[in-house]
Amino acid sequence: MTTTGINLFSFQRKTKILHLSWFAFFLTFMIWFNHAPLMATLRETFGLTPQEVKTLLILNVALTIPARIIIGMLVDRYGPRIVYSILLAISGLLCLLYAMANSFEQLAITRFLMGFVGAGFVIGIRMVSEWFPAREVGIAEGIYGGWGNF
């Protein structure tokens, strides 16, 4: 097995992109699944029924599959940097709207829209594959996916 040319302690060029990509993925993943540690508080604050909790859990992933296709198309057209930047900005806004929700309906709508954030994975895969040569793409994408899903 050959060693890779990835110096994880470097913040130059491709390694900088790798670190920024996995951190962006980490942020999207954290926003996408922020409801899990908050669910007990949400249940109590909003008086959610077990069915409403299940609905929120389903809504969280309902938009993700079509969103990954849409995001993939946008990445092909506009490039990963622009699309990731826009996705991060939108996901931050959605997270704030979710935090300011006053009813189950507002929680449900914002949770559904936050499913779009789960498409961030697609962007980083493309970005990493553009910056790393074929012999390093596997390890780079492993770092991106592994650290991003921390």
Residue ranges and their predicted role:
Residues 66-105:
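Conserved MFS/SLC helix-loop-helix module at the cytosolic interface between two early adjacent transmembrane helices
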Residues 110-147:
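Cytoplasmic helix-loop-helix junction between adjacent transmembrane helices
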Residues 49-57:
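Juxtamembrane helix-start elements in MFS-like secondary transporters
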Residues 16-50:
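Extracytoplasmic
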Residues 28, 57-60, 64, 114-115, ...:
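Structural signature of transmembrane alpha-helices in multi-pass secondary transporters
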Residues 24-25, 29, 61, 95, ...:
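Helical-face signature of the major facilitator-like transporter fold
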Residues 33, 60-69, 119:
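Residue-level signature of mid-helix packing/kink "hotspots" within the transmembrane helices
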